[in-house]
Amino acid sequence: MLVYLAEYLTQFYTGFNVFSYVTFRAILGLMTALMFSLWWGPKMIERLQMLQIGQIVRNDGPESHFSKRGTPTMGGILILAGVFISVLLWGDLGSRYVWVVLFVLASFGLIGFIDDYRKVVRKDTKGLIAKWKYILQSLAALVIAFYLYASADMTGETQLVVPFFKDIMPQLGGFFIVLAYFTIVGSSNAVNLTDGLDGLAIMPTVMVAAAFALIAYLSGHVQFANYLHLPYLPGAGELVIVCTAIVGAGLGFLWFNTYPAQVFMGDVGSLSLGAALGAIAVLVRQEILLVIMGGVFVMETVSVILQVGSYKLRGQRIFRMAPIHHHYELKGWPEPRVIVRFWIISLFLVLLGLATLKLR
């Protein structure tokens, strides 16, 4: 929004031209989202406590989690508000890249809100029925997948980038829709499964978003894109604003979500942020790289699949409890140790993912 005002004011003072630079607006976007989260966080926590919107803890979970019962949840609203305000202020609202991610955040955030509302307000421990949750996620993801496929006017927009191989970028054709769908829905649910300990999901989300900010910047500049053998995507640089807004809002939320948490993000936060990472990966053609950089999310998801599959096929469990972070808790690891070690793994995987941009 302010881009257009600055563009108009440039005719009176050329210094306003600085707002045309994505990097400058990205920094402002990060700071805006961060300060918003820090400023409104205490107010939101107080409001959630007053409304008695508290976390419901399963009786069959780790005993250490019983003390979390009643902790304010649905704090993801704070993250989404910070991201939206920041992007609307500093982003180029004429960019379809921006609106695609905002649509994903809003639609998956609404699904998560309904799920949380049923759990904490209507006291329905199951929340939104899994079938309906999946249907709604699928509808939102397919809308984006079909839109991106139909609106693609450059070959790079529907190519698949394969890490480590600079000359392997096959055209996906109609399979683009399938890949985009599974990337968005899969990422959404993977982050949701990871969000089980204080700060466990938000920090890897911040790291992956920061990495995608760099990738979006490189993909939006023809010289960098050609040098690194990335698809050149004109206008993709605006995704930098979105990514840094997620980083800022996420760090601001972590201020209150770090152990012991004062607030949880709830499904309204985890489903929307996961879907946003998936959508950004699709937009910059880095679906495989998301699997690498978001390896912690993948690990958590695979642990659940293996646990359920093993129990149904053999009647035996592989882990003491799934997702896998609970397994380590039941082994006696203190919660902060599990969290920080998963953060370290996430940092390593993000750096590995960024290294693949050059290791081709």
Swiss-Prot record:
What is the name of this protein? Phospho-N-acetylmuramoyl-pentapeptide-transferase
Membrane-spanning segments: 21-41, 74-94, 97-117, 134-154, 168-188, 199-219, 236-256, 263-283, 288-308, 338-358
Q: How does it sit in the membrane?
A: Multi-pass membrane protein
Tell me which family the UniProt entry assigns to this protein. Answer: Belongs to the glycosyltransferase 4 family. MraY subfamily.
Obligatory cofactor(s):
Mg(2+)
Catalysed reaction(s) here are: UDP-N-acetyl-alpha-D-muramoyl-L-alanyl-gamma-D-glutamyl-meso-2,6-diaminopimeloyl-D-alanyl-D-alanine + di-trans,octa-cis-undecaprenyl phosphate = di-trans,octa-cis-undecaprenyl diphospho-N-acetyl-alpha-D-muramoyl-L-alanyl-D-glutamyl-meso-2,6-diaminopimeloyl-D-alanyl-D-alanine + UMP
Any keyword ATP-binding? no
Q: List the disulfide bonds.
A: none
Question: Where found in the cell?
Answer: Cell inner membrane
Q: Mind telling me which NCBIfam families this protein's record contains?
A: mraY
Q: Which HAMAP family match?
A: MraY
Keyword line:
Cell cycle, Cell division, Cell inner membrane, Cell membrane, Cell shape, Cell wall biogenesis/degradation, Magnesium, Membrane, Metal-binding, Peptidoglycan synthesis, Transferase, Transmembrane, Transmembrane helix
Q: Which CDD domains match?
A: GT_MraY (cd06852)
Q: What is its main location?
A: membrane
- Which gene specifies this protein's sequence? mraY
**What function does the entry list?**
Catalyzes the initial step of the lipid cycle reactions in the biosynthesis of the cell wall peptidoglycan: transfers peptidoglycan precursor phospho-MurNAc-pentapeptide from UDP-MurNAc-pentapeptide onto the lipid carrier undecaprenyl phosphate, yielding undecaprenyl-pyrophosphoryl-MurNAc-pentapeptide, known as lipid I.
